[in-house]
Amino acid sequence: IAPMIHVHTAITIFITFTHLIYIFGYLWTKVTIFAFMKTYTSNHIVFFSPTHTSAKIARAIGESIGMGRRIEIDLTTDENSSPIEIKDSITIIAVPVYAGRVAPIALQRLRRLKGNNAPAILVAVYGNRDYEDALVELRDETIQLGFTPLAAGAFIGEHSYSRPNMPIAEGRPDVTDLQIAEQFGKDCLTKLEKDETLSDFYLKGNIPYRFVGPSTPAAPVCTEGCFACGECIEVCPTHAIALSDEGKIETEITKCIKCCACVKECPNGARVFDTPYTPMLHQKCAARREPELFI
């Protein structure tokens, strides 16, 4: 009888131990999931946005996501090279499209970021022509920087070459665009809550990326209405504009990226950029285009 009692006791102990392991495993899983969900209590809004269109979209997405803490990183005029660590934060990264690609200087400044596997919502803003391979390029770059792409969107912003008499996507992003951006942010958050592994998603674009050759150096100029207030100096992303010893505004043409921030921000309307692309884009890109989202 004694051996049978010992066997029964051993079986009971084994079953109890196995049950405890199961309970511990279950509780650990719950704790892990809870910890995962609690990890994202902040969001970073990162943008390069000379004429503020990318910033508007990024902020609309960020505000709809919420979170207890929101941190903005404006790389537009920041030439600092020190690394920026982002950890445990939903990150919105918004950049302008130049000739179907991410603006080169935007890519250059994004390379300061260290993603640490943070989920990233990628945004390309273009002037109503086409974004072509910009989102694919942005995705590849952010993966290299350590981010995990969560979703992506192509939005429309008023073209840098738009003029009052020849508008190109004038006033974009508008109220409708911002509403779409807000809903996009909410949809991204829903995906994050349901899909912890952040599965891949379809993205429009090509590899290799669209070839973009060197552009002819050109820059906006000042008219007689300029009174050297210096506003253009402050907003230039490449610091290509300076005040001469004679008190005149001068532009280093080889540094200009033709973003036309100086044109749009001049309080006296005294900064102009004449380019044959303005009438061409005004004519060919008149039809309204809508945001395209990939989740």
Walk through the language-model features, giving the residues of each:
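Extreme N-terminal basic, low-complexity initiation segments
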Residues: I1-I15
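Short hydrophobic alpha-helical segments enriched in small aliphatic residues
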Residues: V7-T9, L20-G25, A35
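FMN-binding flavodoxin-like domain, especially the glycine-rich phosphate-binding loop
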Residues: T32-H44, S49-T76, S81-S215, D274-I295
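A mid-sequence, solvent-exposed acidic-amphipathic segment
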Residues: D200-P237
